[in-house]
Amino acid sequence: MIELNQIVKRYKTKKQDVLAVDHVDLSIQSGSIFGVVGFSGAGKSTLIRLLNHLEQPTSGDVIIDGDTIGKLSKSDLRKKRQKVSMIFQHFNLLWSRTVLNNITFPLEIAGISRQEAKQRALELVELVGLKGREDAYPSELSGGQKQRVGIARALANEPSVLLCDEATSALDPQTTDEILELLLKIKEERNLTIVIITHEMHVIRRICDEVAVMENGKVIEQGKVSSVFENPQHDVTKRFVKDDLNDDFDESISELVSLNENDYVVRLNFTGNNATEPLVSYITKTHNLDVNILEANIKHTKDGSIGFLIIQFAVANSEKFEKFKNDLEAQHVSVEVVKHG
């Protein structure tokens, strides 16, 4: 388990102090994939560097598997860092070394014999899908292949924790999905704890179990991914979710919808099994409503599906609308009134 207790990171400059991380508390379960999402300057990259002590916190404790990182001796800290590996946005490969020799590099530093290092590297080459490219140089690889080398190198010392700092930000969408699938596979096979820093909610949705949203150095919202997508609380979180679901039904569009006195435009949010149920059919049959679908989308998460549906319909009175709303919410479909005639 990884625990962050009241973590603060402050930088002093000539003009002012910069509070990069502001009293953050987090608990990350062993064997889980935990995402931290935020816009540029939110403090997320600083936060991840505190986990392996590349940055030292101004105050607070980082505890990994029972060890308080800031209290370890230099030799114990070096050993701990071997078990907390990291991959980066721009790969950080050694351009004068082949794929195989990039992977053996941390093993050489750790004093592993050349034969064992080569054997372990060959196994990792196969694991990340680069068999046949062992003798290639980074300049001969695509972006996705470079990141696969970075992942293999990070796994060389058999870590228990893998930190991913914007690891897919430089990749195209298809390659991003391939790298995410690889991380899922590695996590399952090696029982890794993975912490992912990103500004892409798509990444969070695809593979994370839990997510923390950061703004101005603070964690402003956190929880299970499905819960955060279903019911985001903070405006920043709502923006991330809206962008990922391609929900562009804003007030300017809703103004184009002509409504009579008894008309409603509502947004229905659903997750899990509800995302694949014939909801419109249910509404028309159960509540005898003529439904006009204005917008809809469904996306897939690691644990199921999430989505929204924006519809227009007319009801005779407010009591019937409340009956409709209560019925759907009893089935775990949230109902939000966008506009009322």
Curated annotation (Swiss-Prot):
CDD domains the record matches: ABC_MetN_methionine_transporter (cd03258)
Catalytic activity: L-methionine(out) + ATP + H2O = L-methionine(in) + ADP + phosphate + H(+); D-methionine(out) + ATP + H2O = D-methionine(in) + ADP + phosphate + H(+)
Subcellular locations according to the entry: Cell membrane
Main location: membrane
GO cellular component terms listed in the entry, alphabetical order: plasma membrane
Gene3D superfamilies referenced in this protein's UniProt entry, alphabetically: 3.30.70.260, P-loop containing nucleotide triphosphate hydrolases
Keyword Transferase among UniProt keywords: no
InterPro entries: AAA+_ATPase, ABC_transporter-like_ATP-bd, ABC_transporter-like_CS, ACT-like_dom_sf, MetN_ABC, MetN_ABC_transporter-like, NIL_domain, P-loop_NTPase
EC number, as in UniProt: 7.4.2.11
Binding site for ATP: 38-45
Keywords, sorted A to Z: Amino-acid transport, ATP-binding, Cell membrane, Membrane, Nucleotide-binding, Translocase, Transport
A GO MF label: ATP binding
Signal peptide: none
Membrane topology qualifier: Peripheral membrane protein
Pfam families with a match to the protein in the record: ABC_tran, NIL
Domain annotation ABC transporter: ranges: 2-241
Subunit annotation: The complex is composed of two ATP-binding proteins (MetN), two transmembrane proteins (MetI) and a solute-binding protein (MetQ).
Entry function: Part of the ABC transporter complex MetNIQ involved in methionine import. Responsible for energy coupling to the transport system.
PANTHER family: AMINO ACID IMPORT ATP-BINDING PROTEIN, METHIONINE IMPORT ATP-BINDING PROTEIN METN 2
Family that this chain belongs to: Belongs to the ABC transporter superfamily. Methionine importer (TC 3.A.1.24) family.
Descriptive protein name: Methionine import ATP-binding protein MetN
Organism expressing this protein natively: Staphylococcus saprophyticus subsp. saprophyticus (strain ATCC 15305 / DSM 20229 / NCIMB 8711 / NCTC 7292 / S-41)
